[in-house]
Amino acid sequence: MTVTGIIAEFNPFHYGHQYLLSQAKGLKIVAMSGNFVQRGEPALVDKWVRAQMALENGADLVVELPFLVSVQSADYFAQGAVDILMRLGIDTLAFGTEQLFDYQKLSRLYSEQAEHMTAYLATLPDHLSYPQKTQSMWEAFAGLSATGDRPNHLLALSYVKASAGKKLQLQPIKRLGAGFHSEAKDQCLSSATAIRKHIADRAFVEKSSPNAALILRAPQVTWEHYFPLLKYHILTAPDLTQFFQVNDELASRISAAIRSVATVDELVEAVATKHYTKARVRRVLTYILVKAVEAPLPEGIHVLGFSKKGQAHLKTIKASVPLISRIGAKPWDQLTQRADTVYQLGHMDMPEQTWGRVPIRPGAMN
């Protein structure tokens, strides 16, 4: 039987995600971001609610990406997620993309030319951001042309690199409906960005997600719920460079801006440059928020939920893969758990995110 892996955030789950799951083959394993997502933001609703959404729409197993995989640049995000999915026995990786290319061919190219392609990146001028350099690399070696407003395609190219040299079939699925960043309300399939933007419009959410009731019932948070705590950490930290990926220049820019801004968006605008993208700045601010430092990734894989098929699959691999189904006195990943504690502070009704939580199953949160 085909075992398909999907890397996702489901922030929140919408009809485009439902379509992606419907097109994936065989047993479907989702490696999902936890309570903070790749572009450096708190998830709108918590990871347990999002796992429930996935399971109710065809996923068989949902596992959590550790914090230092979830909140990373595209290449590290992709590599960490693919590594986890490979340990869970996938043979296919399905992903949505704005452009359908022969990604399998691109993966073979990268496995053969990785050294030359990496060397090419080093020759590009420093004023270019890493995403811009990556686009230039693919254009030079494969004739691809993509723009920065097609993030699913750029992530797909990171999946290509992460799967190079592995026995993994790539299944690109054409993204339908609104663009990734679209805030429009008049699209047949609205984006997660639009749902987050218009979350107060109940009718819009109900027409945009098969799990609207779950989304609307759950405590919802945004970056602004955490700005006072972030500001406190910035103002009281003896040295911001102690935190993950905060260099001297970023520390200086953040410290200089923090007293004159009133929101996270204003802080991001003040700190970002052509070299430091807004997404990178948001990730750095997330690291400061949760006091993240460089640490090894956990050996165990945290299971958020499963169907009967997913449970049967877990039984076939549990002897070779350390699976974490309940976090108690012994931590799974201290940094992820600290991030969960911070996340809980964003809403007074936010349920416990770690201690005593067990994998959910379809229908368990009705």
Curated annotation (Swiss-Prot):
It catalyses: cytidine(34) in elongator tRNA(Met) + acetate + ATP = N(4)-acetylcytidine(34) in elongator tRNA(Met) + AMP + diphosphate. ATP binds at residues 7-20, 96, 152, 175. InterPro entries: Rossmann-like_a/b/a_fold (IPR014729), tRNA(Met)_cyd_acetate_ligase (IPR008513). One of its GO terms (molecular function) is tRNA binding. The keyword Nucleus does not apply. GO terms for cellular component: cytoplasm. It is found in: Cytoplasm. Its main location: cytoplasm. The keyword ATP-binding applies. Keywords: ATP-binding, Cytoplasm, Ligase, Nucleotide-binding, RNA-binding, tRNA processing, tRNA-binding. GO terms for biological process: tRNA modification. Its EC number is 6.3.4.-. Catalyzes the formation of N(4)-acetylcytidine (ac(4)C) at the wobble position of elongator tRNA(Met), using acetate and ATP as substrates. First activates an acetate ion to form acetyladenylate (Ac-AMP) and then transfers the acetyl group to tRNA to form ac(4)C34. Belongs to the TmcAL family. This is tRNA(Met) cytidine acetate ligase. It comes from Streptococcus equi subsp. zooepidemicus (strain MGCS10565).
